[in-house]
Amino acid sequence: MSVLWSHCISKLEGELPPQQFNTWIRPLQAVEDGGELRLLAPNRFVLDWVKQHFIGKIEEVVSEQNRDSAPNVVLEIGSRAAEAAQMRSANPPRKTAPARKQVPNNLNSAFIFGNFVEGKSNQLAKAASLQVAQNVGRAYNPLFIYGGVGLGKTHLMHAIGNEILRGNPAANIVYLHSERFVSDMVKALQHNAINAFKEFYRTVDALLIDDIQFFAGKERSQEEFFHTFNTLLENKHQVVLTCDRYPKEIKGLEERLKSRFGWGLPVAIEPPDLETRVAILMSKAQQSGIDLSPEVAFFIGKRIRSNIRELEGALRRVIANAQFTGRPITLEFAKEALRDLIALQDRMINVENIQKTVSEYFKIRQADLLSNKRTRSLTRPRQIAMALSKELTSHSLPEIGQMFGGRDHTTVLHACRKVQELKESDARFMEDFSNLLRILSN
């Protein structure tokens, strides 16, 4: 690493929130080239975000470190020849290990990057996953994907494994649920085979563990995984984890594990927006050989908002009903087929429930949320509640305004735009919004 950039990294780490630093700054690699400091981003998404939100801060820190002749900061997408040479120097080739028996990987070959529908809600997660699959043990290690149920975390995990195998069919990759890891360890202890257990998990090329939150409260399992994790990272083997929440929020998990889970890249997957939901429906229908009209896809996408699993379930119900009855899939037919499901969805998420949840989350009174008070401690939660009401219910802007103390629809529209702006520029705000979305969607 460039000496100058090493000093800058230390400075930025102390000044930026950990999530912002780990997500956007840590992945950058630096090459000093004459009067330039070239920062290499792993992909276009990271490049654009850093240019938009952090380039000013980076240039300021670079100037502070080298006041007399500060180099010009240039952002590019890696990797370049200089970067490759630098990495070869930093990581000399390891001695060839003896041939290993390939282990069963449990991967579902149907889950690949090619059929993962990308949208704003999962764009970063997909980009990071692809980067990991193409740079095993070097891009983001560990990669920690978190979000609610049925949003595509498991799909991405399988896609990573399948992409690694596509590039290296001899790679030893293990995918499993965290409860399987616990079960395997218990069996190993019972049969006095703990050394074989350690050998198996600590020598794979990539370990992909789903739903890591189930380690909570299991002290012996956490102890064993801690050492497995360390061994894999020391040997530059890839670790990918999924969870239903951010690492720091996992109760019953040791602090040393929480800290290590944040070493690489924690990246969130949110419930998909309407356009992504429609794209998913159209893609799934096409895969099933069904001609689904955009009108029907938009209807289903607008009414089923919680997660992708339920969205696909609704589509399967419509298709099955059409096949059983021999009727074409029209808008009226879809409404009829999903009538009870939509009624249940409407009962589960309503504006009053959103107001109550937001008030409890920010520890404010619900009456204050609906009042005319305009202090910052109330304005932000109120705007979030309005935006969530727009996203999670079928109410119009005027209807939402009425339910927020008789406000005008333009106030609701302004709130939605402000929330979108803050989601893109403020990591802490984004985390609060994602937490609330996850609570309500689950």
Swiss-Prot record:
The keyword Nucleotide-binding applies. It comes from Methylococcus capsulatus (strain ATCC 33009 / NCIMB 11132 / Bath). Keywords: ATP-binding, Cytoplasm, DNA replication, DNA-binding, Lipid-binding, Nucleotide-binding. InterPro entries: AAA+_ATPase, Chromosome_initiator_DnaA, Chromosome_initiator_DnaA-like, Chromosome_initiator_DnaA_CS, DnaA_C, DnaA_dom, DnaA_N_dom, DnaA_N_sf. Residues 323-442 are annotated as: Domain IV, binds dsDNA. Residues 1-84 are annotated as: Domain I, interacts with DnaA modulators. GO terms for biological process: DNA replication initiation; regulation of DNA replication. It comes from the Bacteria. Belongs to the DnaA family. Plays an essential role in the initiation and regulation of chromosomal replication. ATP-DnaA binds to the origin of replication (oriC) to initiate formation of the DNA replication initiation complex once per cell cycle. Binds the DnaA box (a 9 base pair repeat at the origin) and separates the double-stranded (ds)DNA. Forms a right-handed helical filament on oriC DNA; dsDNA binds to the exterior of the filament while single-stranded (ss)DNA is stabiized in the filament's interior. PROSITE patterns: DNAA. This is Chromosomal replication initiator protein DnaA. Transmembrane segments: none annotated. The lineage of its organism: Bacteria, Pseudomonadati, Pseudomonadota, Gammaproteobacteria, Methylococcales. SUPFAM superfamilies: P-loop containing nucleoside triphosphate hydrolases, TrpR-like. Disulfide bonds: none annotated. Oligomerizes as a right-handed, spiral filament on DNA at oriC. The gene is dnaA. Residues 84-105 are annotated as: Domain II. It is found in: Cytoplasm. The keyword Cytoplasm applies. GO terms for cellular component: cytoplasm; plasma membrane.
